[in-house]
Design a protein with these regions (language model features):
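Aromatic-residue detector
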Residues: 1, 11, 61, 65, ...
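Nucleotide-state sensing region of NTPase/ATPase domains
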Residues: 2-83, 89-99, 153-158, 186
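Conserved NTPase motor "head" modules and their coupling/switch loops across ABC/AAA+ ATPases, GTPases
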Residues: 4-5, 122-204
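Generic serine detector
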Residues: 10, 17, 37, 56-58, ...
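Short, surface-exposed, polar/charged, turn-prone segments marking secondary-structure boundaries
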Residues: 75-76, 94-98, 104-106, 196-200
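Short phosphate-engaging motifs
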Residues: 83-84, 148
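Long, non-coiled-coil amphipathic alpha-helical linker/lever segments
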Residues: 88, 95-145
Length: 204
């Protein structure tokens, strides 16, 4: 791993690079700040893989991932489920970078649906389109979360010792359905559930 030093004329310039070996194949990766303006010292993030510029830093997720727990997260298992789901999402993204896009897509469509329902007068085709995206993205991301939980449970079961192994699980409507029926049937059930709950959700 090689770390570049800041330039004296512009301390904002910075870069770090390294060589990763996976299954005997080496990949050069690097990231840093590149100056875009001589006038106001503006910079932008640059990511390179094997010497080629990448469109975004998400490309790094196809080669490596990192996860950490900070002191501010020590209430993770004592507070609401939303924070724990976000933490599981970070674990999933470490193995499947596309998961982040599915989460963003689902949350964006959910907010759009809630807004349309609260406004009262809405285009039914547009509302159905938002719900359809919620169905496909929601079931897919829930299945990915459950898959990650099962991976963690498998690891804890393989640990030998006198200390009891932790058993993790996720509880929710989609999670419960996915335990019982195939994903395609869960999509049908979720689609019908969203349709049936429109009247209730517009007042919630």
């Amino acid at each position: 791993m090689k770390e570049g030093r800041p330039h004296i004329d512009n301390p904002l310039k910075w870069a770090i690079s390294g060589k990763i070996c996976c299954n005997g194949l080496f990949t050069d990766i690097g990231t840093g700040l590149e100056q875009t303006s001589e006038v106001n010292l503006k910079t932008r993030r640059v990511v390179k893989i094997d010497g080629k510029n990448c469109g975004s830093q998400s490309a790094l997720g196809h080669h490596l991932s990192a996860l950490w727990v900070t002191p501010s997260m020590d209430r993770l298992f004592a507070e609401g489920a939303a924070g724990r789901r976000r933490f599981v999402d970070r674990l999933v993204v470490g193995l499947d970078p596309e998961h982040a896009a599915r989460v963003t897509e689902y949350e964006s469509c959910m907010r759009g649906r809630n807004k349309l329902l609260k406004e009262g007068a809405y285009n039914k085709e547009w509302l159905s389109s938002l719900e359809e995206t919620m169905v496909t993205s929601g079931v897919a991301l829930t299945a990915s979360r459950m898959g990650m939980i099962e991976k963690l449970n498998k690891i804890t079961r393989e640990q030998y010792g006198v200390f009891p192994a932790a058993e993790l699980g996720m509880m929710g409507k989609l999670e419960g359905w996915l335990f019982d029926v195939p994903a395609i049937e869960v999509e049908d059930k979720y689609r019908a559930s969203l349709l049936d709950s429109r009247q209730y959700d517009c007042h919630s």
